[in-house]
């Protein structure tokens, strides 16, 4: 399947076994968002809430932007930067739950909820962190499916 098995643990505390399976051809409930003119899909199962984004509530810890609108503050991912696009409108924050804790995805708009058929990433895109696949949406557009767990891993490794 192309997944991973991660083993870890601490002496006296136990062993952690993490089985990571890739998104395969499946129907996935998502929240479609827009960022820098592109359609992005966020898996609904990971969404905690939506908030209005206010740049005044961003604090920096080193190179990591944090959203202070929640307690504790959470790391932010500006998806226009992830896409390599010019700065977007940055109106909304999608707070998601990941294996490493909560984080915020900053987007321009919400397009709505949609169940989409996931197409696994092709060879060119397979190694891109944060990319979980693609889908043709109901209106015929291509939506990039985000993998919030990998986005959070990118921030921690940066």
Predicted regions and their residues:
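Glycine/threonine-rich ATP-lid/beta-loop region of ATP-binding domains
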Residues: 1-158
């Amino acid at each position: 399947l192309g997944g991973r098995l991660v083993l870890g643990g601490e002496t006296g505390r136990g062993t952690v076994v993490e089985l990571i399976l890739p998104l395969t051809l499946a129907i996935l409930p998502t929240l479609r968002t827009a960022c820098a003119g592109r359609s992005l899909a966020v898996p609904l199962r990971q969404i905690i809430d939506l908030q209005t984004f206010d740049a005044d509530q961003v604090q920096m810890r080193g190179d990591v932007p944090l959203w202070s609108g929640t307690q504790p503050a959470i790391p932010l991912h500006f998806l226009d930067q992830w896409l390599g696009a010019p700065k977007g409108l940055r109106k909304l924050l999608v707070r998601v739950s990941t294996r490493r804790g909560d984080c915020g995805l900053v987007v321009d708009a919400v397009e709505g909820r949609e169940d989409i058929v996931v197409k696994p990433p092709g060879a060119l895109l397979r190694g891109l962190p944060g990319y979980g696949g693609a889908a043709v949406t109901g209106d015929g557009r291509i939506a990039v499916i985000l993998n919030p767990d990998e986005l959070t891993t990118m921030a921690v490794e940066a």
